[in-house]
Amino acid sequence: MAKLLKDNYDRAYLRRLAAEIAKAEPAFPQQKMLKFIFDSAWEQKELKQRMRHIAQGLQRFLPQDYGTALKSLKQAAPQFGGFEAMFFPDFVEVYGLEDWDLSISALEHFTRYSSSEFAVRPFIVQDQKRMLRQLKSWATSKNEHVRRLASEGSRPRLPWAMALPEFKKDPSPVLPILEKLKADPSEYVRRSVANHLNDISKDHPELVTHLAKQWISGKPETRWIVKHGCRTLLKQGHPGVLALFGYYEPQDLEVQQFQLTPKKVAWSGEVQFEFELVSQASPLGQIRVEYAIDFVRQKGVTSRKVFKLSEGDCAASSKSYRSRYSFKPITTRKYYPGLHRLTILVNGQEMAAREFHLLSETDSAG
């Protein structure tokens, strides 16, 4: 089993953190800090709870003057990186909202080694206009991590993060930031812009469609942003976005020899399916082929999830497909027994469907 991210905060990691802090602040009580962190509730804490607990421990044992504490943290931060080091900006989020200048400088510093994407959001909520000016400034930074923060920190639907309801309602204030970054030389930054665009598409599909039409003829890097940023709209079969990439309503196409087995899928088992896509007027042309499963949820309702099989220009008049879906338990999806439906989609249009039952764990055992 893969190591959980929260378990990276082990004793060796925290001892190293305490030692680095002590280099900047010789009076820092390393053992007291470690005892505080590894308290009786530590094992029950999840990732972000552990992150916050570490930030609280730092605040408790560093000098109580905020600026002095930040100096020590800034000195130690370059020795730590990745998601785990986000307790540095978390310290700013919790204790620095009333000291704007010191805090914004610290967030810019810390994001170079981890990311301040969570910590910057309370500052946006507190003073949106002021923070927008800062975000626009960050978008012009020479450092790719700082430029990414301008986009990632202002995403309206950033996972695990504080929501930004004003940007959900009206994303127009952040569009100039995305415009600045739409052809950024860093893939790290471009991926953030694409994810930001995808966030916006969930509340403002027509706005993103309009932007996509404007951006699609730009540099190859920008075209990638458009494609990745429109992924939700593509899965939803949005006609305007599909057409933008050359995927039009299929004409003279048929799904043939569609087979799905088994009809009764054991708990933790898998469903397999195959079919042939045939054109009556060859070639198949520009096609995006997907399948959707209508999953049973609580109280008998269903929820659809779309999965891509292939896309591109096909010169042949027919093409065979074979795939499977596993119902092995995963943390991001909970399964319920009952009648499911698997549908073949071509360019967003439903072409054929089959039903199958997912058996309960009890029925599967019997």
Language model regions located:
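Surface-facing alpha-helical segments and adjacent helix-coil boundary elements at the starts of domains
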Residues: 1-241, 253, 266-269, 274
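Short glycine/proline/serine/threonine-rich loop/turn segments at secondary-structure transition edges
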Residues: 329-339
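Short beta-strand elements
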Residues: 311, 349-366
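Short acidic/polar inter-strand loop motif in beta-rich domains
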Residues: 329-331, 345-354
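Short beta-strand segments of immunoglobulin-like
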Residues: 259-266
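Short beta-strand and strand-turn-strand segments in soluble, beta-rich domains
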Residues: 253-256, 297-311
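Beta-strand-rich binding/interaction modules
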Residues: 270-278, 282-298
